[in-house]
Amino acid sequence: MRTLWIVAVCLIGVEGSLLEFGMMILEETGKNPLTSYSFYGCYCGVGGKGTPKDATDRCCFVHDCCYGNLPDCNPKIDRYKYHRKNGAIVCGKGTSCENRICECDRAAAICFRKNLKTYNHIYKYYPDFLCKKESEKC
């Protein structure tokens, strides 16, 4: 519970669905979303280019693509609601944009959990300048 409180305090002031996404990541992986995923590999965090470094980084690449398929939505600003049912993330009833953003975040959080065994601390604070290749297509 203390970890949830610390993450919530760290995320105060973060706009939109980033708060919900961070909570999903914490709940699914047990990892602090800010320190474990914000700078991971070539795609986790702001922007992205090159080839994903591993399965976790690919989760971020796919998440970026998912957001890219929402041109009429504001994924980093629009808030949504979700809950858990039998341990699974269930996106709440909201607007079409809110639901699609939630589904993108849900898929990424589940992807992170499924790839916890291959999470590589070498990529935790990976420098952007090492991500040189042209980005893959979504």
Curated annotation (Swiss-Prot):
Compartment annotation: Secreted
SUPFAM superfamilies per the UniProt record, alphabetical: Phospholipase A2, PLA2 (SSF48619)
One record GO biological process: lipid catabolic process
UniProt keyword Nucleotide-binding present: no
Catalytic activity, EC: 3.1.1.4
Cofactors demanded by this protein: Ca(2+)
Disulfide bond positions: C42-C131, C44-C60, C59-C111, C65-C138, C66-C104, C73-C97, C91-C102
Tissue expression profile of the protein: Expressed by the venom gland.
UniProt entry tagged with the keyword ATP-binding: no
Active site positions, chain numbering: H63, D105
GO molecular function term, any single one: toxin activity
Domain of life: Eukaryota
Protein's name according to its UniProt entry: Basic phospholipase A2 vurtoxin
